[in-house]
């Protein structure tokens, strides 16, 4: 399941984020690469321990955990703290699958979901599409600044070469309370239907029944 979430951050907020990011020292992006990815990856990143990157990453996590659509789709249990990357001058990251397990200060997490928060407007760079191969075929993603795409970490994906301009983004992984992608999809669809019916002031008893089904499925499928 691939979910696009628009306007997680406003244009003004993105501009403020970029001012802080652009002033930092960027390093070789292979810091977070697995052994097989190093030959395919050419980009720049902020060091994961950079204090500005850490603070902005926390701001992003706080925003996402307060976003109903993100929480509904991801059912987040634990984040790998957001990182920041930049592509320019032909830089690219060829097809790869993200590492299944990552180490955090609090221990190991299983990467169920990957997310990219775009911090450059699409008209400001040529190329740089996030191309994802999933069960529905190939999808090419290039969202407006402040918008986010969420997709299974098991997906084969790439960032195409940035031929002109600059593509800056935040990227992150997370472990979901529900490991199985198909089960997460069903729960998301059910939750979105419940929210839609609630907005339409549907019959109270039916909403209680549907909500009970949702929570009983979540209870059955979740791993904490």
Curated annotation (Swiss-Prot):
One of its GO terms (biological process) is DNA damage response. SMART domains: P4Hc. Keywords: Dioxygenase, Iron, Metal-binding, Oxidoreductase, Vitamin C. One of its GO terms (molecular function) is iron ion binding. Residues 78-176 form the Fe2OG dioxygenase domain. PANTHER family: PKHD-TYPE HYDROXYLASE YBIX. This is PKHD-type hydroxylase Sbal_3634. It comes from Shewanella baltica (strain OS155 / ATCC BAA-1091).
